[in-house]
Design a protein with these regions (language model features):
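Extracellular carbohydrate recognition and processing domains
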Residues: 105-125
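C-terminal motif of bacterial Sec signal peptides marking the signal peptidase cleavage site
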Residues: 14-18
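Transition segment at domain starts
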Residues: 23-71
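Positively charged n-region of N-terminal signal peptides that target proteins for export
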Residues: 1-5, 10
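Edge beta-strands of jelly-roll/beta-sandwich modules across compartments, strongly enriched
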Residues: 133-152
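Short, surface-exposed beta-strand/strand-loop-strand elements in extracellular ectodomains
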Residues: 89-106
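Extracellular and analogous surface-interaction loops
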Residues: 68-79, 121-127
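A short beta-strand element within beta-rich, extracytoplasmic domains
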Residues: 77-87
Length: 154
């Protein structure tokens, strides 16, 4: 019995291990994954700091989604983001998730179309609003974000 059980358990472990990255990789092209409450990501190297209401971070070999901001708006509220984003490998985008789950891309960059500095604007709708960083496979980037309202997440 043990001879049969051990190989089956090992096969199950290998199968489950192989499934771990599929959600992260699929998120870049699937708004339904981006809109989910949780985050799914893999990061090989991540350095970050939060000071003076500014999130500074550097990531290498990253894939998936990461919530960087949230706000529970009482009414339609204009929001402004000062953003510096440079991608050296892969692709990255910032997405606003409205309370109804609608995903709006605020900014998308790649090494072919790097963005150094931008001021982004959107309207937070009544309810829970979020902004996520969404990274394609093996993305490396440097980013600084500062929001005029809401809560930056570390």
């Amino acid at each position: 019995m043990k001879r049969v059980l051990l190989p089956l358990l090992l096969a199950l472990c290998l199968l489950l291990t192989g499934c771990g990255g599929s959600t992260q990789a699929a998120a870049y092209t699937d708004d339904a994954i981006v809109a989910r409450k949780g985050d799914w990501y893999t990061m090989n190297d991540w350095q970050h700091s939060l000071s003076d209401n500014t999130l500074n971070c550097s990531m290498k070999g990253s894939t998936g989604t990461l919530t960087v901001w949230s706000m529970d708006a009482k009414a339609d509220t204009p929001v402004s983001i000062d953003c510096t984003l440079a991608v050296t490998a892969g692709r990255a985008k910032l997405a606003h998730i409205a309370p109804d789950g609608t995903v709006t891309i605020l900014l998308e960059v790649s090494p072919d179309a790097p963005v150094t500095t931008s001021t982004l604007r959107f309207t937070a709708q009544p309810g829970e609003n979020r902004v996520k960083l969404v990274m394609a496979e093996s993305t490396s980037l440097d980013m600084a974000l500062s929001f005029d309202q809401g809560t930056l997440l570390n």
